[in-house]
């Protein structure tokens, strides 16, 4: 089931959880979507600022599988 997250800090907490499996990064012209797959929900964060998206990509946990989808 999908859930949308509005806060970057909340998204990072979800990404650091034990049951977080992977992150998909979808880029388009207007925004960047980060989707983290946990055991129950697929959490989505939408960012319109490209610089913030790059910083968030750098701050993802190192053990997490990251896929970039164009």
Curated annotation (Swiss-Prot):
Taxonomic lineage: Eukaryota, Metazoa, Ecdysozoa, Arthropoda, Hexapoda
Keywords of the record: Ribonucleoprotein, Ribosomal protein
GO cellular component: cytosolic large ribosomal subunit
Domain of life: Eukaryota
Family the entry assigns: Belongs to the eukaryotic ribosomal protein eL38 family.
One of the record's GO molecular function terms: structural constituent of ribosome
Gene3D superfamilies in UniProt: 3.30.720.90
Organism of origin: Spodoptera frugiperda
GO biological process entries: protein-RNA complex assembly; translation
Protein's recorded name: Large ribosomal subunit protein eL38
